[in-house]
């Protein structure tokens, strides 16, 4: 008997709401706040999110930093707990640090640099973002099935949590 592969078109395998722990969010500028808002909107609009062993959703997701761990508190739409996963932040530290450095360069470049320089920086930014997304998919393997685009949006949220100097 083959295992059912979750589908993005299946409303049981999706996130319908995302919240970020306010205590985990560091102070950030308007560019980061804007990225956070867009990432949440895009994630809720289109995602594939299927916790292993859960009978289906849709789900809500609360993301927090707890000690040196990333916490995914997954619940059903009605608030019933499904599972909480704690992931070590260690595999993300260098990636997030690099991502913030290149984002700073990108935001400075879009104000003054040539289009070629902006494009080169943006390609680097996307490459680091992809690396973080793949790392997140690997860390969630066996816990939550997510497609690459969902992992990208989740990585953006993890990055913009900007865990108070711990990155």
From Swiss-Prot:
The record, for NCBIfam families, names: PRK02853.1
Family statement drawn from the similarity comment of this UniProt entry: Belongs to the UPF0262 family.
From the Swiss-Prot or TrEMBL record, give the protein name: UPF0262 protein Nwi_0248
- Xref: InterPro entries: UCP032146 (IPR008321)
The source organism is Nitrobacter winogradskyi (strain ATCC 25391 / DSM 10237 / CIP 104748 / NCIMB 11846 / Nb-255)
- Top-level taxonomy: Bacteria, Pseudomonadati, Pseudomonadota, Alphaproteobacteria, Hyphomicrobiales
Q: Which Pfam families match?
A: UPF0262 (PF06793)
């Amino acid at each position: 008997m083959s295992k059912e592969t979750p589908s993005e078109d299946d409303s049981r395998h999706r996130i319908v709401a995302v919240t970020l722990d306010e205590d985990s969010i560091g102070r950030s500028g308007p560019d980061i706040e804007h990225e956070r808002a867009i990432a949440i909107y895009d994630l809720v609009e289109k995602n594939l999110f299927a916790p292993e062993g859960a009978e289906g959703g849709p789900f809500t997701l609360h993301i927090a930093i707890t000690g040196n761990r990333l916490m995914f508190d997954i619940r059903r739409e009605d608030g019933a707990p499904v599972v909480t996963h704690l992931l070590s932040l260690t595999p993300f530290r260098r990636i997030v640090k690099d991502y913030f450095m290149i984002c700073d360069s990108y935001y400075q470049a879009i104000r003054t640099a040539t289009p070629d320089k902006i494009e080169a920086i943006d390609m680097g930014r996307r490459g680091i973002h992809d690396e973080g997304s793949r790392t997140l998919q690997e860390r969630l393997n066996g816990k939550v099935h997510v497609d690459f685009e969902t992992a990208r949006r989740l990585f953006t949220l993890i990055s913009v949590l900007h865990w108070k100097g711990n990155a």
